[in-house]
Amino acid sequence: MSYFTAREIASITIFAALWGILSTTLSPIFYKLFHLPFLCDLIGFTSIILAVWWVEKIGTATSVGLIATIINFMFRPTAMHFLGFSAASIIFDILAFTSGYKRLFEQKILGSILLTAISIISAAVAGVIIGALFMSPMALQRWGGVLGWAGLHAIGGTIGGVVGISLVNALISRGITPPKKRKKEGKD
């Protein structure tokens, strides 16, 4: 038996495609207008949170990040900075697993705080990698160096975390829950 079911793989690829396509189409426009990385983080961490909530298995965030990276490179082969988000998705995966999915998604207040913190940490890691390896020194200087760039990504991670958590809570309030939870509740 495989680790991910067919439905889980479909969910992972849908959220990865959402991230990959929106990042290749909208994020460059936002970045050119404002020179801020917030939209990349918002799209990425919202997609990851939704996928992890739906599947609740280690490897989900990593899979979403790697598939989104492949999609990104298919449309924008020179956008090497996206490798920072690949690393961030791995960090997110590890931190979400060690925090416990039950704690993240069944304890609303604690889960919201933890998911936001995980998004902030993961986004900051992406910012450090992108700043250290892929940004020009002139662009970095404007934002206070690598740490300043990591801070901007952390702000984007905060926004993405809040949006992702809000969407999860909105879906739950409308009765939309992952298949595993429906089986436990006898709704499937």
Identify the function of each model-found stretch.
Residues 25-37, 68-96:
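Interfacial aromatic-anchored transmembrane helix boundaries in multi-pass membrane proteins
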Residues 9-14, 42, 46, 58-66, ...:
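Hydrophobic alpha-helical transmembrane segments
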Residues 107-188:
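Membrane-embedded alpha-helical hairpins and interfacial helices in multi-pass inner-membrane proteins
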Residues 13-14, 21, 86-128, 165:
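Short helix-perturbing small/polar motifs within transmembrane alpha-helices
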Residues 1-55, 59:
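Hydrophobic transmembrane alpha-helices
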Residues 3-7, 32, 36, 56, ...:
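Juxtamembrane/transmembrane-helix boundary motifs in multi-pass membrane proteins
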